[in-house]
Every structure is written in structure tokens, then in C-alpha cells.
């Protein structure tokens, strides 16, 4: 029996990475950081922990008679974690490797919202390092 070409070109299902809490994480690094942040929340160091928070990247400006993409959503930035630490909101992203599109989205987010994104990296043996 011969199979047609489309039966061979089907992609294999990608396994979902789930943590011990049942939440689907994008990477093992993000899952480890999420577990660490949950421990910090239980200990009272941080509060209001949220995961995968989407921020629309839309420009709302008009210059005289010219409107530049007024109210049009161009893209969105998804922060890995958002939490409150010492009364301040912290927006955090876990990166093993930061590619150019993600760097650009972070820069656009920081310019539009006026908030700094904390990028965390996992270093073997030493824990988490802020970039």
C-alpha cells in the first residue's frame, strides 16, 4: 500500500510543557522561574502573581492633520510574569536566548507604557540573574 505525500507531511504533535500546577509554560526555563515566583508569593515577598499577561502595542497619536496608525493594534507583547514587589509592579520575561523580534517588542513596550521589563536568565549553579 502506498501512502500519498500529505500523509507523510503531517507534523507530529508538539508536547505541551506543563508544570506541577497544571499551567502550560512555553519553556522549561519559564517553568522553573514560575515555580520560584510561586514560592516567593507563598513566602510573602511578592504578591499578585500573574502569568502570560498580554499588552497590546498600539499607537494612539495624531500629528496635526496626519494620524499615525491611530488606534490600530500592530502587535502585542506577552510578559511571562507580572507581580507586585515592595509596592511596585514588576514585568518580567525569562529568556534563554533573546532573538531580534522579542527584543524589538520589549523596546516598543517600554516606549509605549513607560515601564522597564526585567529580563531574567538562569545561570547554572548560581540561580537567576537580571540583565
Residue ranges and their predicted role:
Residues 1-131:
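Electrostatic, structured charged patches in enzyme active sites and in nucleic-acid/phosphate-binding
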